[in-house]
Amino acid sequence: MNDFATMDDIQTLWRELKPEEMSRAKELLTVVSESLRYEAEKVGRNLDQMISNSESLKNVAKSVTVDVVARTLMTSTDTEPMTQ
């Protein structure tokens, strides 16, 4: 199955990626797309079929995918977690 967004979508809708972000972003596109499919399946929906019937939903899925990937990339993974 195809991802709901592409690397070009990330760079167009968010920002140019740094070289060290490229491979992580590519993997995240698949993870996020599959997560959205899973959530739809949990409520008895086939997201790919729904998207094939609606250009608007296709764009929403793209937007959500880019947003989640961008937020994940902005989250630091090389520092200690904060504690109270």
Where is each model-derived feature located?
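Divalent metal-cofactor coordination and adjacent catalytic microenvironments
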Residues: M1-Q84
